[in-house]
Amino acid sequence: QEDDDYVSTKFIEKSKAGIRLRALKKIIPSTWHDIGYYKHDKKILSNKTYGAPIDYISVHDTTQQEFEEKYKNTYTPCMILGMADDWPAMKTWSFENFNERFPNDKFILANGDEKRIRYKYFYHYVNHKKHRRDDIPLYLFDSDFGDEKRASRVLLDEYEVPEWFDEDFFAILGEDKRPPFRWIIAGPKRSGCSLHIDPLGTSAWNTLIVGKKRWVMFPPHTFKSEKELKTDPGASWFINEYPKYKDKYHIDVIQESGETLFLPSGWWHVTMNLQDSIAITQNFVTDANVKETQRTMINKRPKTYFKWVKLMGDRIQEDRTFDDVAYSSDVYSSSDSESD
């Protein structure tokens, strides 16, 4: 066990040094917690919120048509109850369970240029007292957990795309050709993503399986582009940046295990895990947000765009003019692998 701990720690330190170099400008492991956010966990990880509330609806007393008319078609976020009640994931997924089933699977790290870490090392990291003090904790954000060569592919059978979100115009491209669209997200308390909007004008649903997650969301056009923003993730953003934006309209909500957030296209958002958390999320395109996706793809992925338009046929109309559109390509400039 001592040897395992040594190897695990050394691997983590090597991996972290690479992905944190740009963010922290430091490669010395002892400095990863020198800011000392962990000393303020009681305040940072509290249930107190400051923004506008979010609507809560249930699949048991809301129809899909009602959801689409009130939320999807009006670009209004909401929290949905009951979508994951029957998922096997709600009973089986945990950090321990993943370690038992996929110890040697290499999961993608968030904000790490596709760097990967064997799950057993990540599990050690999450449970090691030393690393739980990190100012910017490691965060899994894996878009290819469903690859046929991965042991983690079985996770696809343990949840299902909610019926309200089963339409996706990108599906026609096939899983190998379409932009990344589904992610397993896992991280310890204090981890999270930076302020961003989801890529290519997509909307998203996000179901929290384990833990508790805080979301702060700003409407489209609140910010001109990500270039004007500080991009510190998780606790760092909430401590240093959030106070600057509290006068802007925003939604501040805590997502509990089993709840599903609907995040419309164009909404800026930042997250922080208040507890060790695991979530599943997918991005999608429907008639409600297809124009935003077209406006982005023509600039970001022109080859894929024209192939997609051709395959869609009469379902969408090709648009080559984007000079006077509502959402500029600069606004929709997020990478394809932003993390929530």
Predicted regions and their residues:
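N-terminal accessory scaffold of Fe(II)-dependent oxygenases
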Residues: 1-260, 270-340
